């Protein structure tokens, strides 16, 4: 077949396949157009997840009738001067969105400029079917109906209305977060699901669009490096989710899903969260336009940086410092949830197993009183011998000051240990409430921070094995261990290659005590294999250190003395990140004294 030009309608449908893959993609393009038009208020209405209908209305600058004709042609835009492709400042610039959408749906475009007349133009799957005057205020209204109705090959790949709605909601939420100066509303099937006012600051907009708990469990980020600025909020490691759906990343006000940024985020939380847990973040990166390329993909969700290592280092280092400064904090949500779930239950009196004596009546009461009887005087004498605590003992002598008074809880943030529950949890009394500590999680963090100091140059003491242990593994695992041998030596693990499918372990960290050497090395090999290239070797070694810390920590089920419990509390108070274990779970929670008093009806 000879080479020929493709028909314009087919070209538009091919372009639509890149730009408009689902209703959420079409919605993103329309809302971005509204933002670029200078809108201060954007209203979005969708039906059946956007499959049946999408409507975006704004109060931006609007278009004339002549501009509306050009807007529906490919590669026609007002946003890109001839020489500005390297310095794009608008969200859209390709001039492909409207014609691409109009080629696979019925699109109604209505617009009016300040002081001009409203105009309406209707395009059905690439063909203009109607146009004429329209009644509306300044701004633009775009209605998209029956998306992919005439492209069954694309429509059958759409998901359920609920899934498509969730994707549309995510698009609006991200764009609303990027522009706190603009008001947004979203209605789905006639029900308003989102409404935020313009003029908010970034932190206020993020809180309004995410969880109310985030404000109390987050850290502010504000960092400058030359002309690059990084701002936003990040959650405490203990405030995390099972999926990464609450990670909002923006570059120059543009929502992106970039592998470099996601990898940097994982690196910052590397030894603070388990692999299957994810922080809640909203990060805004402002970079000179010449240092970033947004013209990578038609959907404009990917970017390329001129100096990616600078950006990655800034994110990892900046977030690490912010987390270090708040390492003692623990999430407050568990304590509040526990308090809400704590319900008062009536306490039934224990069944009577002995004598009940009413001194006022001078008689004994017992279930078998009809069969057994004693003189009242004898009953009273037996009762007093069995229950000596019913009356206070007479005072004798004089009061003496204790030689070693109990320590005051006010002297320490985590209080003074008062006991242990289930050989797992330390109960401490603080100045302003009750503190409960997970002994294994807390000690795990303390061991990890010691190992990390070893990686930073303060060598971790090791203990040589009397008989070196050979651990058999597959060859790729041995290769990874051999490559990381120097880093592992700083952590106190000394090993060397022992043939193609084994390594010989000569020493382990002294602080871990007697451990299962085979299991430790196997877990280290799995950790080195389990993290992709988005993390550097040092970051992966920190994750290895987290695994080692778990092997050598105080286990749940071990009875601790009061001195051991207090020593653990004091060490926690001076250790970075002691508020969470290596898997992102809290190491301690606090029940404020006011909450305790409310439980007993005192407040």
Curated annotation (Swiss-Prot):
Write out the GO MF terms.
ATP binding; ATP hydrolysis activity; ATP-dependent DNA damage sensor activity; mismatched DNA binding
- Identify one Gene Ontology CC term for this UniProt entry: mismatch repair complex
Keywords of the record, alphabetical order, are: DNA damage, DNA repair
CDD domains named among the record's database cross-references: HATPase_MutL-MLH-PMS-like (cd16926), MutL_Trans (cd00782)
Q: Report the InterPro entries cross-referenced here.
A: DNA_mismatch_repair_CS (IPR014762), DNA_mismatch_repair_MutL (IPR020667), DNA_mismatch_S5_2-like (IPR013507), HATPase_C_sf (IPR036890), MutL/Mlh/PMS (IPR002099), MutL/Mlh/Pms-like (IPR038973), MutL_C (IPR014790), MutL_C_dimsub (IPR042120)
Q: Which domain of life is it from?
A: Bacteria
Q: Name one GO biological process term.
A: mismatch repair
What does this protein do, in the record's words?
Answer: This protein is involved in the repair of mismatches in DNA. It is required for dam-dependent methyl-directed DNA mismatch repair. May act as a 'molecular matchmaker', a protein that promotes the formation of a stable complex between two or more DNA-binding proteins in an ATP-dependent manner without itself being part of a final effector complex.
* Family to which the UniProt record says this protein belongs: Belongs to the DNA mismatch repair MutL/HexB family.
Matching NCBIfam families, A to Z?
A: mutl (TIGR00585), PRK00095.2-4 (NF000953)
Protein name, UniProt field:
DNA mismatch repair protein MutL
Designated gene of the protein: mutL
């Amino acid at each position: 077949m000879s080479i020929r030009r493709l028909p314009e309608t087919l070209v538009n449908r091919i372009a639509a396949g890149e730009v408009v893959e689902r209703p959420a993609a079409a919605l993103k393009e329309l809302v971005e157009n509204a933002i670029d038009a200078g809108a201060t208020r954007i209203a979005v209405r969708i039906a059946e997840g956007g499959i049946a209908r999408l409507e975006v209305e704004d109060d931006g600058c609007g278009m004339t009738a002549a501009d509306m004709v050009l807007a529906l042609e490919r590669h026609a835009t007002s946003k890109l001067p001839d020489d500005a492709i390297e310095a794009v400042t608008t969200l859209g610039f390709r001039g492909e969105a409207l014609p691409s959408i109009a080629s696979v749906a019925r699109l109604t475009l209505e617009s009016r400029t300040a002081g001009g007349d409203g105009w309406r133009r209707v395009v059905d799957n690439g063909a203009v079917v109607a146009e004429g005057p329209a009644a509306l205020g300044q701004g633009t209204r775009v209605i998209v109906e029956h998306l992919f109705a005439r492209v069954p090959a694309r429509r059958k790949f759409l998901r359920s209305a609920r899934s498509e709605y969730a994707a549309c909601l995510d698009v609006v939420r991200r764009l609303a977060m990027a522009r706190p100066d603009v008001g947004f509303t979203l209605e789905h099937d006639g029900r308003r699901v989102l409404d935020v006012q313009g003029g908010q600051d970034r932190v206020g907009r993020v809180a309004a669009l995410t969880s109310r708990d985030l404000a109390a469990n987050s850290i502010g980020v504000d960092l400058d490096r030359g002309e690059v600025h990084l701002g936003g909020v990040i959650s405490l490691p203990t405030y995390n989710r099972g999926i990464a759906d609450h990670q909002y990343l923006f570059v120059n006000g543009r929502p992106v899903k970039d592998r470099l940024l996601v990898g940097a985020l994982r690196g910052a939380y590397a030894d603070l969260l388990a692999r299957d847990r994810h922080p809640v973040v909203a990060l805004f990166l402002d970079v000179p336009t010449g240092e970033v390329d947004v013209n990578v993909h038609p959907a404009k969700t990917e970017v390329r940086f001129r100096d990616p290592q600078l950006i990655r280092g800034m994110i990892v280092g900046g977030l690490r410092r912010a987390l270090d400064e708040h390492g003692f904090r623990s999430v407050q949500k568990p304590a509040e949830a526990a308090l809400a779930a704590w319900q008062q239950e009536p306490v039934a009196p224990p069944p009577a197993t002995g004598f009940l004596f009413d001194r006022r009546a001078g008689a004994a009461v017992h279930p078998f009183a009809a069969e057994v009887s004693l003189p009242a005087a004898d009953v009273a004498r037996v009762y007093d011998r069995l229950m000596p605590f019913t009356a206070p003992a007479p005072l004798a002598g004089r009061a003496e000051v204790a030689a070693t008074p109990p320590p005051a809880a006010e002297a320490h943030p985590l209080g003074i240990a008062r006991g242990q529950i289930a050989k797992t949890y330390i109960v401490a009394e603080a100045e302003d409430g009750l503190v409960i500590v997970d002994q294994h999680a807390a000690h795990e963090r303390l061991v990890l921070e010691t190992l990390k100091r070893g990686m930073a140059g303060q060598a971790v003491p090791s203990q040589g094995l009397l008989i070196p242990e050979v651990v058999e593994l597959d060859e790729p695992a041995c290769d990874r261990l051999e490559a990381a041998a120097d880093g592992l030596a700083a952590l106190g693990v000394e090993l060397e290659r022992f043939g193609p499918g084994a390594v010989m372990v000569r020493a382990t960290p002294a602080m871990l005590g007697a451990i299962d050497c085979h299991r430790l090395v196997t877990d280290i090999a799995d950790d080195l294999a389990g993290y992709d290239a988005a993390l550097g070797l040092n970051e992966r070694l920190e994750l290895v250190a987290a695994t080692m810390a778990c092997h050598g920590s105080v286990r749940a089920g071990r009875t601790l003395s009061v001195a051991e419990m207090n020593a653990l509390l004091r060490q926690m108070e001076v250790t970075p990140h002691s508020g969470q274990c290596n898997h992102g779970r809290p190491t301690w929670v606090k029940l404020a004294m006011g909450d305790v008093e409310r439980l007993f009806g005192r407040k």
